[in-house]
Amino acid sequence: MILDYRAFDTFGESCVLFIAAACVLVLLRDDQTDTTAKAIRDERFEPVSDTILQASAKILFPAIMIFGIYILLNGHLSPGGGFSGGAIMGAGVILHVNAFGYKKTQKFFNEKTYKIVTVGALSFYCVAKSYSFFTGANHIPSGIPLGNAGDIISSGLILPLNICVGLVVACTMYAFYTLFKKGGM
């Protein structure tokens, strides 16, 4: 029973994060049609080439992302989980943009990626948990094998739901950062 309520609570929190990011996107988005003015404005937000920061980020960015993924994947076995792992991964992407700039970061994380990942994660979470609304079912016997206790794949739907929460949190942190800093992703 506790898992049922926690899962719906977490889904609600993830939806609130997504709605907040969407509202910030609408309110702070800078929709200039003049491409020259936009290019000049975007150039202003590119970081100055800082050799020390870039060298540090080349080492730290992969380590931060791996640690975030580790926290995310082990959240059902140890302290951590989706929110913690997502916050760490979001901080890693923010480090990348500060070291290498928006142009390089947009090669792997742009507004389209943000929308696909967040909507996909929230949709999966909603579909995975919504059956209890219709059946009144308990979430623990979900039909997914629980595996051996202590293994990564040992918790039914908890691991995929942690991954969904982590993706939403990481994307939202980066979206807030870029929207507050320059008015767009």
Residue spans of the language-model regions?
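Short aromatic-rich membrane-water interface segments that cap or initiate transmembrane helices
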Residues: 1-10, 148-163
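Individual transmembrane alpha-helix segments
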Residues: 1-26
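Hydrophobic cores of alpha-helical transmembrane segments in multi-pass inner/ER membrane proteins
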Residues: 16-25, 91-97, 161-175
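Membrane-water interface at loop-to-transmembrane-helix junctions
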Residues: 41-60
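Membrane-interface helix caps and helix-loop-helix hairpins in membrane proteins
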Residues: 72-81
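Structural signature of hydrophobic alpha-helical transmembrane segments
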Residues: 80-91, 163
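Alpha-helical transmembrane segments
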Residues: 98-113
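A structural-propensity feature for long, helix-poor, extended segments
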Residues: 111-143
